[in-house]
Amino acid sequence: MSVNTDELRHQVMINQFVLAAGCAADQAQQLLQAAHWQFETALSTFFQESNIPNSHHHPQMMCTPSNTPATPPNFPDALAMFSKLRTSEGLQSSSSSPMAAVACSPPANFSPFWAASPPNHQVPWIPPSSPNTFHLHCPQPTWPPGASQGGAPQKAMAAMDGQR
């Protein structure tokens, strides 16, 4: 690579490091140079040093990272958070509150249409009105029961089929 290309690549790596680590550009450059411009190595070094309060006094001491997505929460803290959660039993026991009634009841304009069909009657599927021949293989809906279809809709369907 030419000198300009290397400088450009290094500048881009420094900028990416600053964005990823949230440190100053000069610190990013020092870490990247120390890691021979290996981005992951420099990033690991940065986060290991930032988690060790006195890294130059005790270089052999390693601390567990505490603020990373892969680190589980502190176990006692997690237990305390779970103990604050409530179950739905608390909602049922306090059903006199208006919020509990709203949460457990259907809305006032709720229409249970699915419960209106007769027990042995299955509502047929109505095919889409797109230009295909699928509707020729399906029976036409017969809801409500006992209602007969007039000749006009069948003539319209025949006319539509003739145009295809």
From Swiss-Prot:
Listed transmembrane segments: none
InterPro entries cross-referenced by the UniProt entry: UBA-like_sf (IPR009060), UBA_8 (IPR054109), UBALD1/2 (IPR039310)
Region (Disordered): 144-164
Domain of life: Eukaryota
Residues recorded with modification N-acetylserine: S2
Keywords of the record: Acetylation
Family: Belongs to the UBALD family.
Protein name: UBA-like domain-containing protein 2
Organism: Mus musculus (Mouse)
Designated gene of the protein: Ubald2
